[in-house]
Structures are given as structure tokens and as C-alpha cells.
Amino acid sequence: TSYLMKFEKRIFNSISKYLNPLDIAATPEHLQYLPEELEYDFLLIGYDRIGYGIFRMLEKAKKSFLVIDFNPDIIRRLAGKKIPCIYGDIGDEEILERLDLCKTEFVVSTVPDVDDNKRIIKKIKKENPKARIFVTASVIEEALELYKEGADYVILPHFLGGERVSSLIEAVDKDPKKADIAKLAHIHDLRSRAELEHEHPRDV
């Protein structure tokens, strides 16, 4: 569950300062595939579930992209197919620092951690203000927070299915103005839901 994942993450963060920095930063070669002079239009953070649908859409559209995921089995499989990928937790500052986002047009995070997504938004806004940013939240309150931080769209999996997310990303990629329209409509909808107490309970 998302609660357990956050609990495990807090434990790791609390002990990481006692670990050898080289152990944290090192990424075994079989847990990444990074061709030389790699440039990617899309950065996909999180491959499972919604991320898989987005991945399929990017492949079909023949977009250049990089996948980041915390599941070593997924990264081994992608690396074996020579699909650009990195193993790691996007909440790890070292992973964020490795990313060159200057030419990235679109960043999609399917990781429903509000703090991680705030850091992602902050980094992208600093390095590449023109990039479109889609992030994920578990509840309406966090979604509205992420909009305030500058997200172009916040995915709420309980309200929006994976296929619709992929279709929206594809539409925005073709016409960036559609992101602004979708964002304003979504914020209005979320505020209405919040007033009616349609908030989805947190996973436990």
C-alpha cells in the first residue's frame, strides 16, 4: 500500500546518512541502460500501472524517452530490451541530480508521493520552465497543492483511468494549449468535489 511504501521510505531516509554515499549513488550496469549522447523528449517516472499505458503510448508514437523506476525487475527487463532506463527512487536527490532536463519536453510522474512530486516540479521549473509536467496524487487536497506548485496536470488514479491519462498526454503533446484547458477544468472539478466531500480516502 502507499502507506507502507511511505513508511519504508522514511526508514531508508533515516538510516541513509549512515551508509557509504558510494553505495547509494552507484547504479549497477545491469540496472540501467543509457546510450551515449542520450536525449529524450519524455521522462517517465514510474512504469507500473498507469505508467505502463503511457509507456505503450510513447512507444507507439515513436517518442524518445527515459524511464525511472524503483523496481529492479522492471529495469532489468527494460534494459534487456535496450529501452533507456534508470533504477532508483526519484525521492533520492542523487537520482534527480543525474537528470539533464534541459531538452525534455514532457515529464510524467506516476509516483503518488506529494513531497517527491514537489521536488520534481521545482527542479523542472528551474532547469526547463517550458517543459510540461504531469504528476500524480492520492487525494484531492494533495492534487490542489501540486497545482499551486506549478504542475500542468495532476493525475488522480481513482478518478481518471490509465487510458484517459495516456490520451490526454498524447493530446497535450500535439497541442500544448490543451494542457491549460484541462488544468483549469480539473482544478474547478476538484474544488467542487472537495466542497461536496468527494475526497477519496488514503490507502491504508
PLM region spans:
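Cytosolic regulatory regions of ion transport systems
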Residues: T1-V204
